[in-house]
């Protein structure tokens, strides 16, 4: 087994609309990497499906939103993590109120912090979760920035903020006109893409890369074996071989880029 990372790498994966395969890509990428390296991997779930995908449902519901709605220190976020496999954990979305409204349990501002500052603190806490942190963003908000964050910030704003804050973010997308159109309307950039390729689509890999203005780092063939593995709850123990190989290659590529991005971010902060 090899250790790939030299510093903490945080990668955000997201889709321009539902049904693109983001959560399955994140889970598969994490599973493939922990099997081939000594790195610890944490998934931060902003979409809400990871515990079910990874067979960790019913254990606890406390997670990211609950941490945001408290004044807990960064270390408390790690304590919400569910153990999925050796060196693999998932921090659930949870059920707290990120809006700052009074929920009867102190709201978002018990320590006098607004939502924007608390969300900034979340990214600092995420940095300490594992060697590799994969953020399952889901579908970010179409809003261009956060308006009056202490009063109106919600889970959708959190997802958009995750994309904007990531040193390395990857869009998972099908060669679908509507998905590409939606991407353009979000006014977000991506560093690279994972293309979920379906048969008989008119748009090519090159068309997708041109529209995104970013390279396609991996192509995942639509495979019934993946759906069977997910539907049977066997993704952790029976990751389909073709998907496993694709995710292993993607992990090597993303982690090299992610280490470089993290180093650049550190140099920028130091400057």
Question: Where do the language-model regions lie?
Answer:
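N-terminal regions of ATP-driven nucleic-acid and macromolecular assemblies
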Residues: 8-10, 62-81, 177, 239, ...
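Conserved catalytic-core segment of NTP-binding enzymes
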Residues: 117-232
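Flexible loop/N-cap segments at domain edges
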Residues: 76-95, 101-128, 135-137, 142, ...
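Short boundary/hinge segments that flank catalytic cores
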Residues: 1-10, 216
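C-terminal boundary of histidine-terminating zinc-finger modules
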Residues: 228-251
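Phosphate-binding loop that captures ATP/GTP phosphates
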Residues: 34-90
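P-loop NTP-binding site
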Residues: 193-196, 219-225, 238, 254-271
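Walker A/P-loop phosphate-binding motif and the immediately C-terminal alpha-helix
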Residues: 6-56, 119, 126
């Amino acid at each position: 087994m090899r250790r790939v990372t030299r510093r903490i790498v945080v990668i955000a994966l997201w889709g321009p609309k539902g049904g693109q395969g983001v959560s399955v890509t994140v889970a598969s990428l994490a599973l493939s990497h922990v099997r081939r390296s000594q790195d610890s991997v944490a998934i931060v779930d902003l979409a809400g499906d990871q515990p079910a995908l990874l067979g960790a449902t019913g254990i606890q519901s406390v997670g990211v939103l609950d941490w945001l709605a408290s004044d807990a220190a960064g270390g408390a976020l790690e304590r919400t993590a569910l153990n999925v496999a050796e060196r693999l954990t998932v921090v659930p979305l949870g059920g707290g109120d990120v809006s700052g409204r009074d929920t009867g349990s102190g709201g978002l501002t018990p320590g006098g912090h607004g939502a924007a500052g608390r969300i900034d603190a979340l990214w600092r806490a995420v940095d300490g979760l594992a060697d590799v942190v994969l953020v399952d963003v889901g579908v970010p908000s179409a809003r261009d920035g956060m308006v009056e964050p202490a009063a109106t910030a919600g889970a959708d704003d959190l997802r958009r903020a995750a994309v904007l804050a990531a040193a390395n973010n990857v869009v998972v997308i099908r060669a679908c006109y509507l998905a590409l159109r939606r991407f353009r309307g979000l006014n977000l950039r991506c560093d690279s893409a994972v293309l979920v390729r379906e048969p008989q689509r008119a748009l090519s890999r090159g068309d997708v890369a041109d529209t995104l203005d970013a390279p396609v780092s991996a192509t995942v063939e639509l495979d019934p074996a993946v759906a069977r593995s997910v539907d049977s709850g066997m993704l952790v123990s029976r990751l389909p071989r073709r998907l496993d190989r694709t995710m292993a290659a993607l992990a090597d590529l993303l982690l090299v880029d992610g280490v470089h991005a993290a180093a650049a971010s550190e140099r920028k902060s130091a400057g």
